[in-house]
Design a protein with these regions (language model features):
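Internal helical hairpin/lid segments
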Residues: 214-246
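SAM cofactor-binding core of SAM-dependent methyltransferases
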Residues: 1-6
C-alpha cells in the first residue's frame, strides 16, 4: 500500500497491526534529499517542510519534518527487523556539519542494535552508468545475523576487502588516469547509440521536448550534454531540461 511512511509507521504504533510482510531480509530506501542537497537551502534537520512537502503550521522543525524522515525509515527497520538495510542520499549530506555521524548513530541504535559500517560516497560513473551521479550510501547489518568473525571485521576502521560490503569500482571516470583493472567509463554516446529516432515512435512522450532557455553553467538547466562524456545527474522529478543534440 502506498502512503507516507510517517502515517504507516504511526498507524502501526496505534493499532499494532504490522502492514509489512514477514521475514524481510533487506530494507532499502532513499529519504528526502532536498534539505541536504547543495542545490537547496540546506536546512538539514531544521527543515520546516512537513513529510507531505508543505510548510509546517508552527513553522518549527519536528520529528515529522522532511529533513528528519530518515527517522521513519529507522522505524520501519525496527518493525521489520531485516538482516540488512541500505539507505541513500545526496553527497551534500556528508559535509553538512555532523549530520552523517548523527544518522549513522541513530541507525546503530535500532532495537537490539545494528552494525552500521561507515557511510561511503559512490559515483555512478565508476560502475558503468553514463551519468555523473554521486550518492552517499548507509549500510547496516542486524548483529544476530552475522558470524562473530564478520562482526569483528566489519567493526574495524579499515575493513578487509573480503568483508567490505561496498562494491568495487569497475570503470574509471573521464579525465582520470586509466587503471589496469578498470574499464573506460560508458559515454552518453555509447549508451544512446542504436536507439530509434523520436519521430519514428507513436509514443507522444518520445516526441516532447523542452522549450526552456539556457540558464547558465551554475546549474544543469538546459545544458547540452557532452555525448563523449557523462550526462548530468538525472533528477527524480523527471525535469531539468537537459538537452542531447543529434
Amino acid at each position: 500500500k502506498l502512503g507516507s511512511i510517517v502515517d504507516i509507521a504511526k498507524k502501526y504504533k496505534e493499532d499494532g497491526i504490522n502492514p509489512f510482510p514477514e521475514n524481510i531480509d533487506v530494507v532499502t530506501g532513499g529519504f528526502p534529499c532536498q534539505d541536504f542537497s547543495i542545490a537547496g537551502k540546506r536546512q538539514g534537520f531544521q527543515s520546516k517542510k512537513t513529510h507531505q512537502g508543505l510548510m509546517a503550521e508552527a513553522g518549527t522543525p519536528s520529528i515529522e519534518s522532511r529533513g528528519q524522515l530518515y527517522m521513519w525509515m529507522r522505524e520501519v527497520i525496527a518493525i521489520t527487523k531485516p538482516k540488512v538495510f541500505i539507505a541513500e542520499n545526496v553527497k551534500g549530506l556528508v559535509n553538512l556539519g555532523d549530520v552523517k555521524e548523527i544518522i549513522e548513530d541513530d541507525f546503530r541504535n535500532i532495537g537490539d542494535g545494528y552494525l552500521v559500517v561507515p557511510a561511503k560516497v559512490l559515483h555512478a560513473g565508476e560502475f558503468g552508468v553514463p551519468q555523473s551521479r554521486e550518492r552517499v550510501i548507509f549500510i547496516g547489518f542486524r548483529r544476530d545475523s552475522l558470524k562473530k568473525e564478520a562482526i569483528r571485521e566489519l567493526s574495524k576502521d579499515r575493513i578487509n576487502n573480503i568483508y567490505d560490503p561496498y562494491p568495487k569500482e569497475t570503470h574509471y571516470l573521464p579525465n582520470a588516469q586509466p587503471e589496469f583493472f578498470k574499464t573506460e567509463f560508458v559515454s552518453v554516446r555509447k549508451a544512446l547509440q542504436g536507439l530509434g529516432e523520436p519521430e519514428d515512435s507513436d509514443d507522444p512522450a518520445h516526441q516532447a521536448y523542452s522549450k526552456a532557455k539556457f540558464m547558465g553553467r551554475h546549474c544543469q538547466g538546459q545544458i547540452e550534454v557532452d555525448l563523449d562524456g557523462l550526462a548530468p545527474t538525472i533528477r527524480a522529478e523527471h525535469h531539468g531540461n537537459i538537452e542531447v543534440s543529434r
